[in-house]
Curated annotation (Swiss-Prot):
Species whose genome carries this gene: Shewanella woodyi (strain ATCC 51908 / MS32)
Annotated pathway: Amino-acid biosynthesis; L-isoleucine biosynthesis; L-isoleucine from 2-oxobutanoate: step 3/4; Amino-acid biosynthesis; L-valine biosynthesis; L-valine from pyruvate: step 3/4
Catalytic activity: (2R)-2,3-dihydroxy-3-methylbutanoate = 3-methyl-2-oxobutanoate + H2O; (2R,3R)-2,3-dihydroxy-3-methylpentanoate = (S)-3-methyl-2-oxopentanoate + H2O
Keywords: 2Fe-2S, Amino-acid biosynthesis, Branched-chain amino acid biosynthesis, Iron, Iron-sulfur, Lyase, Magnesium, Metal-binding
Protein name, UniProt field: Dihydroxy-acid dehydratase
Family statement: Belongs to the IlvD/Edd family.
Cofactor(s), by name: [2Fe-2S] cluster; Mg(2+)
Entry-linked NCBIfam families: ilvD, PRK12448.1
Top EC category: lyase
Entry-linked Gene3D superfamilies: IlvD/EDD C-terminal domain-like
Length: 616
């Protein structure tokens, strides 16, 4: 039977000093010998997805202590990608994932915690905590802050749903009046919670359900709804159950690496493809798999993308549905239920909410569940009242959306598309692959041939788009923005938004070794690997080159001869120390970012740090 990790600092005469310090935190004599459960919170007043989390740790702690454990809370950082977008702040977003993972590891291992509750929500926080949880491999459960309500306003006499991207596009579109732009801005983000569409934060919180690491509803129940309170309380109870199973009964199925195994990663990626999740999830799943010591790669993602249909279409791919609508349709469990009936997932995978996924779906999939409490749970809806407070309303839809032919979630035979929402492309410009969110690409653009318009940075690309350099038929190439070359692999939401505002959203393509916000739509191809700074072919593209994109064939090609390509590579290598670096780019890079760049890998490896580089 495994010994409690915390015994290292709580048992034996030689730990008198440590016990004295534990007592100073409120630990009583009767507490020593109980499991110490770490609560990793991510409250901050900088981020709407985290502004309401201050008291959530106390909720979880109360449930843990009622169940016989000791709860100790600490906090991590949280970067708001939307606020950091479009300026130097975005360089810090992806590297913050590694800092979050490290900080959780540091706190949990330094204090010998026995188990972990991760209170996360936004873009890099859930992935960072996931990496730490799989690295530590102690009992863990995730509970997120939940999505915000969709914005709503009246324009031209019609009530429309809004999100952050609508505000960005309107602000850059000269055809939108100042009055309408301000109206959209004031309405786009009405409440606390992660942005209301299927952006990165919500995608990742949904994927924790598929990985088996969070409770049903975690990814879809609104942050403002009173029903979400029970998720936090249940997380506290469940983590004690998991800790008991492992430490008292030697049940290793309670450990995250046994829950999030290869089959679970396949389930998560299958869900991601079916719901058209953010392309950033590919980075984070690849990174998580490495921490879990699971051999899950871009090849597996490519294989799955060819057979999984697009069953759930959500903003930014359509203005009709937001996360509140996904929840009404049964949430993640509704999508997984349809995938299960299509024979596309492993329903024997372990899950923190039950014995296995099959058992969990039997209760929580509204298409098969007979439990009226479950239908009531998924009827939780928005109030339409601006607020920064969690659990502030108890509104409900009159009915759930169980229309699997024309609703938000569909059966396989009525899918939005038999092609999934994400695809891996490869070719001479991306030898190790790249990612496109096909859910946001118009069918007429699934094949595209255009002329390269090359920029050495996101800033130059934005200036070129707004300055009229980019015209219909161009393929905008933004390079040296990968994990190493940026450094930090910036999101390119502003360039894609500005293309839309110029009426070029369907007339141009954009490819980059950077990445895209979950709010991006259009023919936007990111994660080009190897990146330019690592010697990737994208660093050899010249303005005017012909680029051929064929999503059905999963190919992307720089249409020049092998001889010409070899000559360009030779010329680049001849530049010595200036090879594979941007020309004339002025950018302040801090010591912290330089340290990240030294170890960063390209996107096909999850942009994780490779410490073996220190040994070369």
């Amino acid at each position: 039977m495994p010994k409690l990790r915390s015994a290292t600092s709580t048992q034996g005469r030689n730990m008198a000093g440590a016990r004295a310090l534990w007592r100073a935190t409120g630990v009583k004599d009767s507490d020593f010998g109980k499991p110490i459960i770490a609560i990793s919170n991510s409250f901050t007043q900088f981020v709407p997805g985290h502004v309401h989390l201050k008291d959530m740790g106390s909720l979880v702690a109360g449930a843990i202590e009622e169940a016989g454990g000791i709860a100790k809370e600490f906090n991590t950082i949280a970067v708001d990608d939307g606020i950091a977008m479009g300026h130097g702040g975005m360089l810090y977003s992806l590297p913050s994932r590694e800092l979050i993972a490290d900080s959780v590891e540091y706190m949990v291992n330094a204090h010998c915690a026995d188990a972990l509750v991760c209170i996360s929500n936004c873009d890099k926080i859930t992935p960072g905590m996931m990496m730490a949880a799989l690295r530590l491999n102690i009992p863990v459960i995730f509970v997120s802050g939940g999505p915000m309500e969709a914005g709503k306003t009246k324009l031209s006499g019609d009530i429309i749903k809004l999100d952050l991207v609508d505000a960005m596009v309107a602000g850059a579109d000269e055809r939108v009046s100042d009055e309408d732009s301000e109206k959209i801005e004031r309405s786009a983000c009405p409440t606390c919670g992660s942005c209301s569409g299927m952006f990165t934060a919500n995608s990742m919180n949904c994927l924790t359900e598929a990985l088996g690491l969070s409770l049903p509803g975690n990814g879809s129940m609104l942050a403002t709804h009173a029903d979400r309170r029970e998720l936090f309380l249940e997380a506290g109870r469940r983590i004690m159950d998991l800790a008991t199973r492992y430490y008292k009964h030697d049940d290793e199925s309670a450990l995250p690496r046994n829950i999030a195994n290869f089959n679970a990663f396949e389930n998560a990626m299958t869900l991601d493809i079916a719901m058209g999740g953010s392309s950033n999830t590919v980075l984070h799943l690849l990174a998580g798999a490495q921490e879990a010591k699971v051999d899950f790669t871009m090849d597996d993602i490519d294989r799955l993308s060819r057979k999984v249909p697009h069953l759930c279409k959500v903003a930014p791919s359509t203005p009709k549905y937001h996360m509140e609508d996904v929840h009404r349709a049964g949430g993640v469990m509704g999508i997984l239920g349809e995938l299960d009936r299509a024979g596309l997932i492993h329903n024997d995978a372990y899950h923190v909410a039950g014995k296995n996924l099959k058992e969990v779906l039997a209760k929580w999939d509204i298409a098969q569940s007979q439990d009226e409490a479950v239908r009531k749970f998924f009827s939780a809806g928005p109030a339409g009242i601006p607020t920064t407070k969690a659990f502030s309303q108890d509104c409900r839809w009159d009915s759930v959306d169980d229309d699997r032919e024309g609703g938000c979630i569909r059966k396989r035979e009525f899918a939005f598309s038999q092609e999934g929402g994400l695809a891996v492309l490869s070719g001479n410009i991306a030898l190790d692959g790249c990612i496109v969110k096909t859910a946001g690409v118009e069918e007429e653009n699934h094949t595209f041939i255009g002329s390269a318009r090359v920029y050495e940075s996101q800033d130059d690309a934005v200036a070129g788009i707004l300055g009229g350099e980019v015209v219909a038929g161009d393929v905008v190439v933004i390079r040296y923005e990968g994990p190493k070359g940026g450094p930090g692999m910036q999101e390119m939401l502003y360039p894609t938004s500005y293309l839309k505002s110029r009426g070029l959203g369907k007339a141009c393509a954009l490819i980059t070794d950077g990445r895209f916000s979950g709010g991006t739509s259009g023919l936007s191809i990111g994660h080009v690997s190897p990146e330019a700074a690592a010697g990737g072919t994208i660093g050899l593209v010249e303005t005017g080159d012909r680029i051929e994109i064929d999503i059905p064939a999963r190919s992307i090609k720089l249409a020049i001869s092998d001889v010409e390509l070899a000559a360009r590579r030779s010329a680049m290598e001849s530049r010595g120390k200036q090879a594979w670096k941007p020309v004339d780019r002025i950018r302040e890079v801090s010591l912290a970012l330089k340290a990240y760049a030294l170890l960063a890998t390209s996107a096909d490896k999850g942009a994780v740090r490779d410490v073996s580089k220190l040994e070369d």
